[in-house]
Structure formats: C-alpha cells, structure tokens
Amino acid sequence: MDIIHVQHPLSSIYTAEAEPCVLPLGFFDGVHLGHQELINLAKRIAKQQDLKLAVMTFFPHPKQIIGNDQTPQTYITPLEQKAKLMQDLGVDTLIVVNFDSAFAHLSPSGFIEDYLCGFKCKHAVAGFDFRYGHKGKGNLETLKIEGKRFFEVTEMKKFEIDHEKVSSTKLRNLIAEGRFAEIPAYLGSYFESQGTIDSIDNQHVIVTLSEAFLTPPPGEYLIEIQTEGYVHEGIAHQIMDGSFQRSWHLHFNDSFPCKGKKIHIKWKSESIKKSKQMKDRRAKSIAKVQAF
C-alpha cells in the first residue's frame, strides 16, 4: 500500500501520478466495523469498475484545528496503526491530508475540485453524516449535486448493532469508562495500545503508554501481550502513588520474555476475579516499587 501525505494547497506532483480510483472518505478513528463495512463496500465497487481503491483521511483530528484545542489529541488508532489496518483491508493507496487552518477554510466546492478531482476520484463513498469544506457546510447531498459532473457517489446508511450506531465516539466513551469487554462488538477486536518497557523483573513489567493512544482510566484490567509467537495473559494496573498517569504495571503468570522496548497491549476486560497467586505477586511488586 502506498501512503501519500499532502497539505493544502495540493501540489500537482501528487495529482499527476494519481490513478482513477474509488475513494472512501472519513477520519476513520478506530477503523471500527462501520468503517470496515464502508471500505469493503468501496472495495467491491472498485473491483466491479476495475479501479484502484484509495482512502482519504485527515490528520490531526479536525477539532484540534477548528476547536482551537491545543491539547495533543489521543486516538483509538493513531495514524501508524490506522495505516496498518487499511493495508489489511486491501487498500491500494492511503491519502493523508494535513488538516491545518488553510485546509479548514477550503470551500466545499474547492475540496471537490482540488482533492477529489485532483486524485482522479471516479466514485466517492462516504457515511450518511460525512461533512466537508469550511465549517462543515458540505454534506452527502452537496457531494452528490456538485460532484455529479465528475464522479458517482454512494452513501452508506447508518451502521448499527442492536439498534445503536457504531461510531468512534461510542468507542472512545467505552475506553474512557474502562468497559473493554464490550469493545469487540463494535471494533471487531480488542482495543490495543502501545507501550514502552521501562523495566522487567520476571513476571512484573513496568511500561509507559504511548501518548498517541487513548489511555484507560485508573483501574485493574485483564490484558494480553503477543511476543515471539506466544500469547501472554496478565493483569495491568496503576499504583496511585503520584506517578505519571501513563505508567502501568503489568503482571504475568510466567516470566515475560521480551526483546526490544515496544509492546502492544490488548485490553480485554476489567479484572474482577483474580487468583491468589496474582494478588500475591502484585503485593510483592507494589512493595518493591514503594521501597524504591
């Protein structure tokens, strides 16, 4: 998969090399089941029309620019992880538009002419609530009306599970509340974040979570780590001793074999029942930290 990073005004260097494509549009944080349905719909259209499948997304999150929010944004799937998921879905080209003030002031018709036509879009696919252009003035209806001279438009209706819309907002709320067991029903997999290993002492690992990912609330959770082809299940928790919020303590039944500093953590559920053995190990770990 090719990844193209562009910013406004769009350079002809990129558009000159563009191939006719089907183009799903959206921010796609999480690449949840609704996003996957939309991209797979676009993929089927691309196959039928013998076109490339490109996806257009944006970075950083629009609200950081539009809302003038200076706080660094955190994501369900930061850009690097989003790109990997797009590749797994069979996307040929990922177009990442730098969402800055100049781009935010682009008119809806300017977005269509500069970006969709610029990247030779022959068929656009977007969710029913997709907005674009300055102050979000563009919507699916304007996309169909203004774009009909250049491309077809397919609208994906609201994607629901148990009569509830699947959305990134829903997932962000579940993560904020630590309700990880409910997430696979909407995401298609467990929520996963990345951490940097600070120290390892047999079954006890201290990690600092990446600032790019959403952070679980303080608590104790069942987790899963995959290293060297093996799955290791354990417990993650924070010690409320004034330490930095992104520092977490992981405990495993066996010694933790890990090469390198980066690990990916799957957050599976809140830990309610814990074995006495795990409790004892946790108590010993806490004592070590406090003594240090």
Feature roles, as predicted:
Residues 1-21:
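Positively charged, low-complexity intrinsically disordered leader regions
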Residues 21-23, 54:
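Conserved beta-strand elements of the Class I
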Residues 24-42:
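Di-metal (Zn2+ and/or Mg2+/Mn2+) metal-binding site signature of metallo-dependent hydrolases
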Residues 32, 86, 124, 183, ...:
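Residue-level signal for inorganic ion chemistry
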Residues 37-97, 101-114:
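Core alpha/beta nucleotide-donor-binding catalytic domains of modification enzymes
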Residues 88-182:
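Contiguous mid-protein beta-loop-alpha structural module that forms a pocket-lining wall or clamp
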Residues 148-234:
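Glycine-rich, Lys/Arg-enriched anion-binding loops that position phosphate/diphosphate groups
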Residues 199-292:
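Phosphate/ribose-recognition catalytic cores of enzymes acting on nucleotide-derived substrates
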